């Protein structure tokens, strides 16, 4: 099945480079262990370029073939526990006992905790989840694609922002974070690359793929998530208990980084 869509922006094209975004896969060095561009998932999602990656997942731009709309696709890819041969789709899980346990439990935890995100679908400043499924020995979350640039990308261009400008970003983000907590969830991955600034001046909290249901195990999670410089101490230990304080710390660290560049 062939689709005349740019793997960078998913607009219709006749050839590369893309006249809309300039993307050309022939001149871009991709991530070797990522899904090949052009992969079809669940029979209905076209996979494009990598948007970002973290300790437990890879996010791709995608196209919903049936509904004809752009989406973001998050793949469960726990660093240090799996590998993928270049050009292939399936994952190879390492043979250690720890990795085998992750294979059995990790994808289910990923999907179970992702389902909790449906609780916050009505929060305007949080990206919506559209689909969940398993394939290629792993799991996937399909989310709305949010146009714009991340706070991280903005700061790379502008440098630190004054508070008068930064508060227009953080006040809505903090209010959205509070609503997430009221729904019984903690995000656990607040950082400059998970705050999206849209062309119309709004802010969206991205990537609730690490979200934790606070009603389960007193906030403890078997999915360890940490981001240097932004995650609090409890996220660096498997016995750490996450709560609203986890996101408060990460949001405060993000504010500090935005104001100082450090």
Q: Whereabouts are the PLM-identified features?
A:
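Conserved activation segment of eukaryotic-like protein kinases, specifically the C-terminal portion
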Residues: 220-234
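Conserved short submotifs of the Hanks-type protein kinase catalytic core
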Residues: 136-150, 154
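Protein kinase catalytic-loop region centered on the HRD/HxD motif
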Residues: 173-185
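Activation-segment/catalytic-loop signature of the eukaryotic protein kinase fold
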Residues: 131-132
């Amino acid at each position: 099945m062939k689709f005349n869509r740019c793997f960078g922006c998913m607009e219709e094209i006749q050839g590369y480079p893309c006249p809309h975004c300039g993307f050309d896969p022939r001149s871009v060095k991709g991530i070797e262990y990522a899904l090949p561009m052009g992969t079809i998932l669940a029979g209905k999602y076209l996979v494009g370029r990598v948007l970002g990656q973290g300790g437990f997942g890879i996010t791709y731009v995608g196209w919903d073939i049936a509904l004809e709309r752009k989406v973001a696709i998050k793949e469960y890819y726990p660093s240090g526990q799996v590998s993928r041969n270049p050009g292939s789709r399936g994952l190879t899980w390492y043979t250690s006992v720890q990795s085998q346990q992750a294979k059995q439990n990790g994808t289910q935890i990923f999907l179970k905790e992702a389902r909790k995100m449906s609780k916050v679908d009505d929060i305007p400043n949080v990206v919506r989840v559209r689909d969940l499924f398993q394939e290629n020995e792993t799991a996937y979350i399909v989310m709305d694609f949010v146009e714009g640039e991340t706070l991280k990308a903005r700061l790379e261009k502008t440098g630190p922002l004054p508070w008068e400008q930064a508060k227009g970003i953080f006040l809505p983000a903090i209010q959205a974070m509070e609503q997430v907590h009221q729904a019984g969830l903690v995000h656990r991955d607040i950082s400059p690359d998970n705050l999206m600034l849209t062309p119309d001046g709004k802010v969206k909290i991205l990537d609730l793929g690490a979200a934790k249901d606070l009603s389960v195990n007193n906030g403890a999670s078997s999915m360890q998530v940490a981001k240097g410089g932004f995650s609090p101490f409890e996220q660096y230990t498997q016995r750490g208990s996450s709560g609203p304080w986890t996101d408060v710390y990460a949001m405060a660290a993000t504010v500090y980084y935005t104001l100082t560049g450090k």
